[in-house]
Regions:
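Short alpha-helix carrying the canonical HExxH Zn2+-binding catalytic motif
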Residues: 1-3
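Short amphipathic alpha-helical face segments that pack within enzyme cores
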Residues: 31-39
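Post-HEXXH active-site segment of zinc metalloproteases
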Residues: 5-31, 50-60
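Long, well-structured alpha-helical subdomains associated
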Residues: 24-26, 38-102
């Protein structure tokens, strides 16, 4: 969810205007969020606990459709996810700097 948080214009400006209306756009954003979660967990040394959810199959199906229809989608999603992770890390560094100054 924290990767979704980075989307608004005052953060990273990912356009989510069609998220609720367009299944393909929703799948793209969800793929970005999932990759961002994976990248953050790897950076922080967190081993995710996998809990099967009823909607996992539908998420995977939507990602597969996007990835099949657009060969660049995985690279675009990865780039957006990496930008989100870098943004989140920058906030952590800024907060740490503020604590040092205070």
């Amino acid at each position: 969810e924290v990767t979704h948080w980075t989307a608004p214009a005052h953060r990273l400006a990912r356009d989510l205007s069609r998220y609720a209306k367009d299944k393909s756009e929703r799948a793209r954003e969800e793929l970005i969020a999932e990759l961002g979660s994976c990248f953050l967990c790897a950076d922080l040394g967190i081993v995710p606990e996998l809990e099967p959810r009823p909607d996992h199959a539908s998420y995977l199906d939507s990602w597969l459709k996007v990835l099949t229809d657009d060969r660049r989608a995985i690279f675009q999603a990865s780039a957006h996810a990496q930008r989100a992770v870098a943004f989140l890390h920058s906030l952590q560094l800024a907060a740490a700097d503020e604590r040092l100054v205070a």
